[in-house]
Amino acid sequence: MAIDSKPHDDLQLFKTNLHPCGYWPDRWASDLVMDPNDPRLGAIYPQTLAWGFRRSGNLLYRPHCEHCNACVPVRVNVNAFVPNRSQRRCLARNATLVTRIVPAERNAEQLSLYRRYLHQRHPDGGMDGHGAIEFDQFLIGPWGYGRFMEIREPATNGTPGQLLAVAVTDLTHQALSAVYTFYEPNAAARGLGTLAILHQIHWAQREQRPYLYLGYWIKDHFKMDYKRRFQKLEIYDGYRWRPFSTTYPTTHTL
């Protein structure tokens, strides 16, 4: 992985101990983590997205596994994006829903949806016991970039409609980053995860941000392969961003 760190030559990266892979049950993983005590993290966070890093709470990390390079950083070139037929159907199916951007501040309604989502969609995944403290630690960043994009049923008699999804999104001066999305598990047929990304792309276009970072694409993984459907997609090969291809190798060069 190449990092253009000339303005930050003293950046410190730490490699974590091995831990069970969150994607493949028979593999072990490790990550590179930027020094969480570095006071510059908030300022350089937008640039770290272009280096393939992700945010989890106040930690900036990227996978760095000795014998596996399956996690490939991807981003959508929003100005070149064209929705496919399935995505157009998703937009039409959900045309009556209401989307709004709110501050990244937890409320009881959001927390209830988050806990329901984890309990039904990720049981025994290590997160299904999350409460208010874990919600804040995981989703709300300390640097002021975070926003919550809420997707709701239409209002009735002035009362907001049911909260169906929350897309935690970081808005930087260079791009948007899709941090985490959770939604009503009983409304999965609506394709709310896809809808959230489509609205994030529109949001980036509206804010004149050229990219939406989607985290890591994992080829043929049932939870992560969907990201390739949002074209024009770009991948980070460890040195530079390239047009998406399922055949590009990745590296972990420092």
From Swiss-Prot:
Q: Does the keyword Acyltransferase apply?
A: yes
InterPro entries the record matches: Acyl_CoA_acyltransferase, Asp_Glu_LeuTrfase, N-end_Aminoacyl_Trfase, N-end_Aminoacyl_Trfase_C, N-end_Aminoacyl_Trfase_N
A Pfam family annotated for this UniProt entry: ATE_C
What start-end ranges are recorded for coiled-coil regions in this protein?
A: none
The places in or outside the cell where this protein is found are:
Cytoplasm
Where it mainly occurs, coarsely classed, is: cytoplasm
First-tier enzyme category under EC: transferase
Q: Name one GO biological process term.
A: ubiquitin-dependent protein catabolic process via the N-end rule pathway
What's its catalytic activity? N-terminal L-glutamyl-[protein] + L-leucyl-tRNA(Leu) = N-terminal L-leucyl-L-glutamyl-[protein] + tRNA(Leu) + H(+); N-terminal L-aspartyl-[protein] + L-leucyl-tRNA(Leu) = N-terminal L-leucyl-L-aspartyl-[protein] + tRNA(Leu) + H(+)
| Annotated EC | 2.3.2.29
Protein keywords: Acyltransferase, Cytoplasm, Transferase
**Example GO molecular function:** arginyl-tRNA--protein transferase activity
* GO cellular component terms, semicolon-separated: cytoplasm
Question: What is stated as this protein's family in its record?
Answer: Belongs to the R-transferase family. Bpt subfamily.
| UniProt cross-references to NCBIfam families, sorted A to Z | PRK01305.1-1 (NF002341), PRK01305.1-3 (NF002342), PRK01305.2-3 (NF002346)
Task: Name the job this protein performs.
Answer: Functions in the N-end rule pathway of protein degradation where it conjugates Leu from its aminoacyl-tRNA to the N-termini of proteins containing an N-terminal aspartate or glutamate.
Q: What is this protein called?
A: Aspartate/glutamate leucyltransferase
Q: Which species does this protein come from?
A: Xylella fastidiosa (strain Temecula1 / ATCC 700964)
